[in-house]
Amino acid sequence: MTAHFPFDNSYVALPPNFFARVAPTPVAAPRLIKLNRPLAVQLGLDPDLLETPEGAEILSGNQMPETAASIAMAYAGHQFGNFVPQLGDGRAILLGEVVDRNGVRRDIQLKGAGRTPFSRMGDGRAALGPVLREYIVSEAMAALGIPTTRSLAAVLTGETVLRDPIQPGAVLTRVASSHIRVGTFQYFAARGDLASVRALADHAIARHYPEAAQAPSPYLALLEGVIGRQAELVASWMMVGFIHGVMNTDNCSVAGETIDYGPCAFMDTFDPKTVYSSIDQFGRYAYGNQPPIALWNLTRLAECLVRLLADDDDKGIEIAQTALGGFAERFNAAYLAKLAAKLGLFTSQPDDQQLSQEFLTALAKGEADFTLAFRRLSDAAVDPSDLGEVRALFADPAAFDEWAPRWRARIAAEPQDATTRQAAMRRVNPAYTPRNHRIEAVIRAAVDRDDFAPFEEILTVLANPFEEKAEFARYAEPPQPHEEVLETFCGT
C-alpha cells in the first residue's frame, strides 16, 4: 500500500523564476530514525505507512509521491549584513504542500536531499548532528508554544558526508507554514522585478494574511502583519533564552515562524551579550541584539515593498517608515507582558517594568542560570518569604537580595492566591529547555555509537517542558564546567 501524501501545491503556480524544478538525489540505504507520529496525523498522513521501508524511501527522497511537485526555491539575503543576490535552497527540496486537519496549508520539505541549481559549491547533503539538533530544538520550541517550523522525520542515508569530522548523512523532513523569507522578496526586488514582488506579496497575503486582502492598502497590511508576528516571535525567544545565531534575512520567515536552526542555542548563564554561533565573530546576533536585528530585517522587507505602497517612492518610504515605527511598541508590549507573567505579575502597575528589568540585571550581575532562576522563583511563589533556592543560583546575590523584598511586596498586591500564582508562573517558566550540553551528548551518542536512546529520551522530556518529573531532574540542571558548550556550528 502506497504512503499517500495529499499534496495541493500552490507555490508552483507562481512564475517559473520563483523556483527550479529538481528531484532529490537518491541515497544508498535509508533508515528511519524517528517519525513524528502526532504531526503526521495532523498533516493527514498515515504514520503506520510512513514507518515502513517504503516510507523511509519517500522520507529520504528515493521515491516521490505521485502528487509531489519537487522544487528548490529561489531567494537572496543579507548574511551578517552583506547582501548576496542569489542564495536559494542549496540542499533543501520542497516536495509540496498539504492542507492539514485544521485547514492550514503546510509545506513538506526534505532538508539534505541533494544538490540543486542553488547549491553553489555545496554537496546538497546534511550531516546527522545538525539534523538531530534541528529535530530536537524545533519540536521543543513547538512544545514551548513558540511559532516554529516542525520536524516530521529524520532518516539516515547510509552514506557519509564530508564535514569536519566526517559524519553519517541524514535527511530531515521539515514542515512549515511556508518557506517564504524576507530574502525571497529581496531576490526579486534586487532585480528590479516589481511584477514578481507583487505576485509574491499577493501569494503571501492569500496564504498567511488573508485579512490584509480586505484592507484599504493590502500591501501595507501585509507589512504590518509581518512586523507584528516578528515582534511577538522575538519577544517569545527572549523569554526562554533562545539565541537563533544566524538572523540573516534569508532566515527570517514572512509567516512569523522560527526557521533554520543552524548554530542556535539556549542561554545558560544570563548575559545579554551571549553568543554561541562560531560564525558570529562580532556578536551581531547576540541574545540582546535580536530585537534590533529583527527590525533591521523588517526594514529590508519594507524596502522591497516601497513601490507597492505608493506610486511615488518618497510617499512609499514614508508609509514604510511609519509601519516600521510600530515595531518597538509591538515588541515592547509583548516582551514586558511576557516578562511580567514570568515574575507572577498579572495586573499592571507603573513600576513593573523597572522591577522586571532589575531582576534581569540581578541575574546578569549574579551570573545566574536564566531558565532555572525563573523556574525556582515559580517554585517559591507559594511562600515568597523563603527564596533560598533562588538565591543559591547567584554567584553574587547582592543585587538579588536588594530586589527580592520589592518583588515580595509587589506580588502581595496581586489578587490571586499563592497557589494560583504559582501554577500560572509554572505555565510560562519551563523546567526544561534544550540545553546545549544535553543536545551535544545526544549527538555524540548517535554519531559515535549509533545510539538513539538519548535522542528519544530528550524528545520525551522536552515534549512537556513545564511539567517537572523527578526522573528527568538532570535535564533541568545547568552544565557543569566540564560540560559547557561554548560554541555551536552551522553544520552545513
From Swiss-Prot:
Which residues take part in binding Mg(2+)? N251, D260
Which principal EC class is assigned to this enzyme?
transferase
Q: Which reaction does it catalyse?
A: L-seryl-[protein] + ATP = 3-O-(5'-adenylyl)-L-seryl-[protein] + diphosphate; L-threonyl-[protein] + ATP = 3-O-(5'-adenylyl)-L-threonyl-[protein] + diphosphate; L-tyrosyl-[protein] + ATP = O-(5'-adenylyl)-L-tyrosyl-[protein] + diphosphate; L-histidyl-[protein] + UTP = N(tele)-(5'-uridylyl)-L-histidyl-[protein] + diphosphate
Xref: Pfam families: SelO
- Binding positions for ATP per the UniProt entry: G88, G90, R91, K111, D123, G124, R174, R181, D260
Q: Does the keyword Ribonucleoprotein apply?
A: no
Q: Where is the active site?
A: D250
Give yes or no: UniProt keyword Nucleus. no
- Entry's Gene Ontology molecular function annotations: AMPylase activity; ATP binding; magnesium ion binding
Q: Which UniProt keywords apply?
A: ATP-binding, Magnesium, Manganese, Metal-binding, Nucleotide-binding, Nucleotidyltransferase, Transferase
Instruction: Report the cofactors.
Output: Mg(2+); Mn(2+)
- What EC number(s) are associated with this protein in UniProt? 2.7.7.-, 2.7.7.108
Identify its protein family. Answer: Belongs to the SELO family.
Query: What is this protein's function per UniProt?
Result: Nucleotidyltransferase involved in the post-translational modification of proteins. It can catalyze the addition of adenosine monophosphate (AMP) or uridine monophosphate (UMP) to a protein, resulting in modifications known as AMPylation and UMPylation.
In Swiss-Prot or TrEMBL terms, this protein is called: Protein nucleotidyltransferase YdiU
Please tell me the species this chain comes from. Answer: Rhodopseudomonas palustris (strain TIE-1)
Question: Which taxonomic lineage is given here?
Answer: Bacteria, Pseudomonadati, Pseudomonadota, Alphaproteobacteria, Hyphomicrobiales
What gene name is given for the protein in this entry? Answer: ydiU
